[in-house]
């Protein structure tokens, strides 16, 4: 089932320097909660500056949903320590509040009013909040409070020079973009390995169903918890953050211009369903527009091609201008075993896997095959640890045992690991291969199995509260290592000043901005 990557691996072993200078970044979301696990109803802490313009600390959907961002970094330990400093400083500013350590929220009552993230009075700030109002009215607020970790990854220029013979970013942007699209197609075909190893949401609180019927064969563990015995990541299931109306958009990952055309089509195609919501009620805006996507960010995807945008640019305009600059991997649940929701083992695994995705052959994929890849993901998400589970290839009928496919993949990953270890010294990447390979013989070693044992004993709420308390104490007591308190104070003040500047420079009425998004 795994493509034959032996030639590409032999090439890599002859050109190890092609992997010198991989760049990464991390984003981590987490809900602010009270000591009893209920959602905090306070505003974004003033000590954390402006959520609109702060470089490292912002908010996602809700005012209580923090998002932490690291700068681009070539050093894994430095990046994780930076992320930990942001957590340490934040933990000290939250008073009695904690950071929820799980992807799935728990103590949110059906119909509870969840305050949307607020970004001030500027047009861009108001548009961000209105976009969230649209998400709430389209999908419900509860789905939007699910948290994850995003891993941003780019291969060094040396890789593309050695692999494709490109000279620089400008002349090589077509070849580099094609290379990243190959990675994305492989990710759709084989990325289910991420929830298998690291999925950590095998259960949900009953409040999450909000009384809606479900066809999933949930088991009840008392204490208001529903779980699937072999599930890995309900966050990635249809219960979690997905968007059914998008499955027939026909967006593919074969060609940059085709991809962008599909995205632009979706933000201009009216939706009958969303038209029923309306645009305004009693003078209050309800969504940016009633198209299938209000803006490009609404496209739900487990992985995204990206380029840093310039002022006023949409994500797709940036891609057309400069090609794909990096890839955003979006399938990681919050790691409940780490105070910062992610650890070095995961980052190293993703390095290995994304390099493999860039090396392995990846035939073009129709939108039909893209939908078929979802079958494997759904199997792993809902019953990934089930003994004897099999997976298919695309829309074909042949089936292969997951455990064997995983072991075959790791045989390749080990060779990538040897190359990366030869550059960095030590055995860190090969050690990750040893640790994770064991999960295919013994699924009880996976994150989902480990956290489910605790959840069945303590409930989701009990597990989440205990971890939140432990990490709060730990983070508050640890000294800062890279950033100083003065750095955080300076960034708070600078971010507030930047927001004021944005607000002062607004020249057009908000309605004119909305008209451009119609």
UniProtKB/Swiss-Prot annotation:
UniProt xrefs under NCBIfam families: glu_cys_ligase (TIGR01434)
Record EC number: 6.3.2.2
Ribosomal protein recorded as keyword: no
Superkingdom of source: Bacteria
GO CC, alphabetical: cytosol
Membership in a protein family: Belongs to the glutamate--cysteine ligase type 1 family. Type 1 subfamily.
Pathway(s) served: Sulfur metabolism; glutathione biosynthesis; glutathione from L-cysteine and L-glutamate: step 1/2
Stored InterPro entries: Gln_synth/guanido_kin_cat_dom, Glu_cys_ligase, Glut_cys_ligase
Protein name: Glutamate--cysteine ligase
Pfam families linked to this entry: Glu_cys_ligase (PF04262)
HAMAP family: Glu_cys_ligase (MF_00578)
Species this protein is from: Klebsiella pneumoniae (strain 342)
Gene3D superfamilies xref list: 3.30.590.20
Molecular function via GO: ATP binding; glutamate-cysteine ligase activity; metal ion binding
Catalysis: reaction(s): L-cysteine + L-glutamate + ATP = gamma-L-glutamyl-L-cysteine + ADP + phosphate + H(+)
GO biological process: glutathione biosynthetic process
EC top class, as a word: ligase
Keywords from the UniProt entry: ATP-binding, Glutathione biosynthesis, Ligase, Nucleotide-binding
């Amino acid at each position: 089932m795994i493509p034959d990557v032996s030639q590409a691996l032999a090439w890599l072993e002859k050109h190890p320097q092609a992997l010198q200078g991989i760049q990464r970044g991390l984003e981590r979301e987490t809900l602010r909660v009270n000591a009893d696990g209920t959602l905090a109803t306070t505003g974004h802490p003033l000590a954390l500056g402006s959520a609109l313009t702060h470089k490292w600390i912002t908010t996602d959907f809700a005012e209580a949903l923090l998002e932490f961002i690291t700068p681009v970094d070539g050093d894994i330990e430095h990046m994780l320590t930076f992320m930990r400093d942001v957590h340490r400083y934040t933990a000290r500013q939250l008073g009695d509040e904690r950071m929820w350590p799980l992807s799935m929220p728990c103590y949110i009552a059906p119909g509870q009013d969840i305050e949307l993230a607020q970004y001030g009075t500027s047009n861009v700030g108001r548009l961000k909040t209105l976009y969230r109002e649209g998400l709430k009215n389209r999908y419900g607020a509860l789905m939007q409070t699910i948290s994850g970790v995003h891993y941003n990854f780019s291969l060094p220029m040396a890789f593309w020079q050695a692999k494709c013979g490109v000279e620089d970013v400008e002349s090589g942007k077509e070849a580099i973009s094609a290379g990243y699209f190959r990675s994305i197609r492989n990710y759709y075909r084989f990325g289910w390995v991420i929830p298998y190893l690291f999925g950590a949401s095998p259960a949900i609180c009953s409040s999450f169903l909000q009384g809606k019927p479900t066809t999933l064969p949930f088991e009840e563990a008392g204490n208001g918890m529903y779980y699937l015995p072999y599930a890995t990541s309900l966050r990635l299931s249809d219960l979690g953050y997905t968007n059914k109306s998008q499955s027939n958009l026909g967006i593919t990952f074969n060609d940059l211009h085709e991809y962008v055309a599909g995205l632009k089509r979706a933000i201009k195609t009216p939706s009958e369903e969303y038209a029923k919501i309306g645009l305004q009620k009693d003078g209050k805006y309800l969504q940016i527009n009633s198209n299938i996507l209000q803006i490009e960010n609404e496209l739900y995807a487990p992985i995204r091609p990206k380029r840093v945008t310039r002022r006023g640019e949409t994500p797709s305009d940036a891609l057309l201008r400069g090609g794909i600059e990096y890839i955003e991997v979006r399938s990681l649940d919050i790691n409940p075993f780490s105070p910062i929701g992610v650890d070095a083992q995961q980052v190293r695994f993703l390095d290995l896997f994304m390099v493999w995705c860039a090396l392995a052959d990846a035939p073009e994929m129709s939108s039909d095959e893209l939908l078929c890849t979802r079958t494997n993901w759904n199997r792993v998400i809902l019953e990934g640890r089930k003994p004897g589970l099999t997976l298919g290839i695309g829309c074909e009928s042949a089936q292969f045992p997951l455990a064997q496919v995983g072991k075959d993949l790791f045989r390749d990953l080990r060779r990538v690991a040897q190359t990366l270890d030869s550059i960095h010294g030590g055995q860190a990447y090969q050690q990750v291969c040893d640790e994770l390979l064991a999960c295919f013989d013994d699924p009880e070693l996976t994150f989902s199995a480990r956290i489910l044992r605790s959840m069945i004993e303590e409930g989701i709420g009990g597990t989440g509260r205990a971890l939140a308390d432990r990490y709060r104490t730990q983070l508050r007591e640890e000294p800062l290592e890279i950033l100083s308190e003065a750095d955080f104070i300076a960034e708070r003040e600078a971010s507030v000043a930047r927001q004021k500047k944005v607000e002062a420079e607004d020249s057009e009425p908000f309605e004119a901005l909305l008209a451009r998004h119609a």
